[in-house]
A protein has these predicted regions:
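Catalytic glycan-binding domains that act on GlcNAc-containing polysaccharides
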Residues: 71-73, 78-261
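N-terminal export signals and maturation junctions of secreted/periplasmic proteins
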Residues: 29-99
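Secretory targeting and sorting signals
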Residues: 1-31
Length: 261
């Protein structure tokens, strides 16, 4: 960690993206390691774009984010990393769009992929699949946040509209948002006219916006850790996401060539 990153962490936003405040909440089982410290920020990478990214004319919507990265690049990196190509298209499209709208954030696709792996195994947890349109089916819904040991206590905030539970909130979708966070940050990455936490493009873009709001500059150790801590305060979680994010852009992979900030 840099000296700045070793300072006491800034206060975490009151509403976290992930399922719990006290424990690991992703559907995937994180690697456990005693005596951890906050990690250094993994290298942040951008994919090869399908075409030069240009801002739309005023009042014109962005294209669906799944088409923003180069198709051949997606195929090669999906094959190398094992990330489902449709999920990878969502991560990379979100990173490319945020690079245009918030270039100071420095968010790489690999950080989104690291979170997606830990939270839901890229939308494949419990035999779920990512459909060609980006919908994850069956829907991935976490356990009730009822204050059980290691879990936050979050009474229902959405009448069960997103998570099917009118008593307790649950994290939902491939990026595992709690309903209150989704209500605040929801994005329409698929350009369908609605935001859906179970649609990968919407979920990935929402995660990108949330991370940038929480960490500001994700190329710095402090900014990256602050962003991921906003998703989940567990040090094991943060280290697990960092390890996956760095693995996905290993130097001998096609994703590492001339695509960094």
């Amino acid at each position: 960690m840099t000296q700045a990153a070793s300072r006491r962490r800034r206060a975490v936003p009151a509403v976290l993206a992930g399922a719990a405040l006290l424990a690991l909440t992703g559907c995937a089982e994180p690697r456990q390691a005693p005596g951890l410290e906050y990690p250094s920020a993994p290298a942040q990478r951008l994919p090869e774009a399908a075409a030069p990214a240009e801002a739309p004319a005023p009042g014109q919507p962005w294209a669906p984010i799944a088409g923003l990265a180069d198709e051949q690049w997606l195929e090669a990196v999906a094959d190398r990393t094992g990330i489902p190509q449709r999920a990878l298209a969502a991560y990379t499209g979100a990173a490319l769009l945020v690079e245009q709208t918030r270039p100071e954030c420095g968010l790489g696709w690999n950080t989104l992929a690291g979170i997606g792996q830990v939270e839901s195994q890229h939308g494949t947890y419990a035999d779920a699949q990512v459909q060609p349109d980006g919908q994850v089916a069956p829907a991935i819904i976490g356990i009730p946040l009822d204050g059980s040991p290691g879990l936050a206590e979050i009474p229902d905030t959405d009448g069960g509209a997103l998570d099917g539970d009118a008593e307790w909130d649950r994290a939902v979708g491939p990026m595992q948002f709690i309903p209150a966070t989704w209500e605040l940050y929801a994005q329409d990455g698929s350009r369908s006219g609605a935001s859906d936490p179970h649609q990968f493009d919407d979920a990935a873009l929402t995660a990108a916006v949330y991370l940038c709001e929480s960490g500001e500059d994700l190329t710095s150790d402090e900014g990256w850790v602050d962003a991921v801590v906003a998703y989940n305060q567990s040090m094991e979680y943060v280290n697990d996401v960092a390890a996956h994010a760095q693995d996905y852009v290993s130097p001998d992979g096609p994703s590492a060539a001339d695509s960094s900030y």
